[in-house]
Structures are given as structure tokens and as C-alpha cells.
Amino acid sequence: MAWRLMSSYWHSQEKWKARGLLAGVIALTLGQVYMLVLLNGWNNDFYNALQQRAFESFWPLIGQFAGFAFLHIIFAVYAVYVRQVLEIKWRKWMTDKYLDRWLGHQTYYRLQVAGQDDMDNPDQRIADDVNSFVNLTLGLFVGVLKQATSLVAFV
């Protein structure tokens, strides 16, 4: 059921925009993991330099850390931004689709005639359900991707 809900968007007329945004989310997430690997290596160099009292390498390592931290922040911010753009586009598409189904072909009128019109605010329910579905689906995907690549990168 969830797969059918997801796949309809990825095969719609917006599929190329959606796939491009998803590729951006994946690339930025992988970039974040790569920056974590670089920071891990930096930690080794930094604390070895401190332990060996190699103070001449202290400031260059601090500069390197600043560069790594800056890049990691850039990756993280853009990953959130691109994910939210994808989320908004997906939510808008799904909400429009289900509102059209609800309001099209006199569906609401037929339910009212049949005496099944006791639902209040169906448009709000559709919007909330779509929001939850898209948010949780993308969150789960990005979380699994980030944790799996971190596991592979650090093991």
C-alpha cells in the first residue's frame, strides 16, 4: 500500500524534478558522511599532535578543522533545504491528487446523499495525512541512508 502511494509521484509528470531533488538529497547526505570521515581522521592527527607536543602543527590543524566544519555545515544546511523542497513538491502533488479525487466526479455529493457525510474537514484531514506520510517516508529514507553509509564508512 505504501509503495503504491509513493510510486505514483515518482512516475508522475513531476518525476524528473523529483528524481533530481532526491539525487541531490542523496549526494548531500553522502557528502555529510564523507565530511564525518574526514573529521574523524582530523581528530587522530590533532590529538596525536597534542600528545607529541607538536605545537607547530596546532594552528594548521585548527585551520583544517575550520574548513572541514564549514563544509560539513554547508552540506547539512543544503541537505535540509533540498529535502524540504522535495517534501513540499511531493506534498503539494499528493494533496492536489487526493483533493481532486475527493471533489471530482461528485464524490462528496454522492457520499452526502448516501448519508455518509459525517466527516468534518476532509480537506484538512487529507492535507495532514499527506504531510505525515511524506515527512515520515523521506525521514526514514534519509535516516537509513545516512546510518547505512556511516556504518560502511566507519567499519
Please give the residue ranges for each predicted region.
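Transmembrane-helix bundle segments that line or gate the permeation/cavity pathway
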Residues: 36-39, 87-88
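Inner-leaflet juxtamembrane helices
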Residues: 79-95
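Short cytosolic helices in intracellular loops of multi-pass membrane proteins
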Residues: 91-108
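Hydrophobic alpha-helical segments in the permease module
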Residues: 65-75
